[in-house]
C-alpha cells in the first residue's frame, strides 16, 4: 500500500497545527520550525491571500487524511461507506478512521504516533483476538482484544512507549489497557467527543458532495 514517506514536519506546517505525526520528544526539538515558519513549506508568502471556499474544504480534508495517514483513494472509500451508513456522514467518517487498528494502538499508548503504530502492525507484531493482523486499516469492534506479540514485548520501543503513556495518562476512554499483560480491549465505539483533531467534518462532506 502506498504511503507518504517524506518529512512529516512539512505536512504539519502545511496544515498549520500539530497532527500528532511525531512523538512529543522529537516534536519539541522541531517546535521552532512550526512556530517561526507559520506558512506552508517553500518561500515565505509575500501576502496572505483570502482562501476560497474550495480551498478551505480541501484543507480540512487534507488535515484529516494526514493525521490518520490515509491516502486519497482509501479516504474516498471511507467517505462513501460513511455516507451509506445510518447516522451523520461526517461523524461516521471520523469513527471509521478512529477504529483503524493502527489508530487503536496509538490510542492505547503502545505507539507514540500513528506512523509508528503502522510500522508495528506491518511487521506483524500485533495480535487481534489471538490472531496476527498485519493490515493497518483493520477495523476493530467492541470486545476486540489487542495484544503485543510475546517476542516484541521486550522491545525498547514498547517499554519506552508504555512508560510515556503511563506518565501522561494518554489512553483513550473508549479502550482499556493492561500494560502488565501488553494488551488492551475495545470497550465501546469512539464518538465525536473522542476526536482530538480540530476538524470541521461537515466541510469535508460538502466537498465530496459536489
From Swiss-Prot:
> What is known about what this protein does?
One of the primary rRNA binding proteins, it binds directly to 16S rRNA where it nucleates assembly of the body of the 30S subunit. With S5 and S12 plays an important role in translational accuracy.
Name listed for the protein in its UniProt record: Small ribosomal subunit protein uS4
Question: Which Gene3D superfamilies did the record assign?
Answer: Ribosomal Protein S4 Delta 41, Chain A, domain 1, RNA-binding S4 domain
The family database entries (HAMAP family) matched by this protein are listed as: Ribosomal_uS4_B
Q: Where is the S4 RNA-binding domain?
A: 99-162
Q: What are the GO cellular component annotations?
A: small ribosomal subunit
The record's keywords, sorted A to Z, are: Ribonucleoprotein, Ribosomal protein, RNA-binding, rRNA-binding
Q: Which family does it belong to?
A: Belongs to the universal ribosomal protein uS4 family.
Keyword hit for Nucleotide-binding: no
Q: How does it assemble?
A: Part of the 30S ribosomal subunit. Contacts protein S5. The interaction surface between S4 and S5 is involved in control of translational fidelity.
The segment annotated Disordered runs over 30-49
Q: Which gene encodes it?
A: rpsD
What GO molecular function terms would the record report?
rRNA binding; structural constituent of ribosome
- Report the SMART domains cross-referenced here: Ribosomal_S4, S4
GO biological process annotations for this chain's record?
Answer: ribosomal small subunit biogenesis; translation
Q: Does the keyword Ribonucleoprotein apply?
A: yes
Amino acid at each position: 500500500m502506498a504511503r507518504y514517506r517524506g518529512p512529516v514536519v512539512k505536512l504539519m506546517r502545511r496544515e498549520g497545527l500539530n497532527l500528532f505525526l511525531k512523538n512529543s520528544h522529537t516534536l519539541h526539538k522541531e517546535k521552532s520550525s512550526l512556530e517561526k515558519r507559520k506558512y506552508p513549506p517553500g518561500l515565505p508568502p509575500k501576502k496572505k491571500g483570502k482562501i476560497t471556499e474550495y480551498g478551505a474544504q480541501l484543507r480540512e480534508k487534507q488535515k484529516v487524511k494526514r493525521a490518520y495517514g490515509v491516502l486519497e483513494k482509501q479516504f474516498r472509500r471511507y467517505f462513501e461507506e460513511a455516507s451509506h451508513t445510518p447516522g451523520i456522514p461526517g461523524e461516521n467518517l471520523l469513527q471509521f478512521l478512529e477504529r483503524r487498528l493502527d489508530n487503536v494502538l496509538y490510542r492505547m499508548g503502545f505507539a507514540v504516533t500513528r506512523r509508528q503504530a503502522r510500522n508495528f502492525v506491518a511487521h506483524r507484531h500485533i495480535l487481534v483476538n489471538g490472531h496476527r493482523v498485519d493490515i493497518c486499516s483493520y477495523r476493530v469492534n467492541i470486545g476486540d482484544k489487542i495484544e503485543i506479540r510475546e517476542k516484541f514485548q521486550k522491545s525498547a520501543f514498547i517499554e519506552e512507549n508504555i512508560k510515556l503513556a503511563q506518565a501522561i495518562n494518554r489512553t483513550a476512554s473508549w479502550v482499556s489497557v493492561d500494560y502488565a499483560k501488553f494488551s488492551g480491549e475495545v470497550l465501546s465505539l469512539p464518538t465525536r467527543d473522542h476526536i482530538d483533531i480540530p476538524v470541521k467534518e461537515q466541510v469535508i462532506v460538502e466537498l465530496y458532495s459536489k
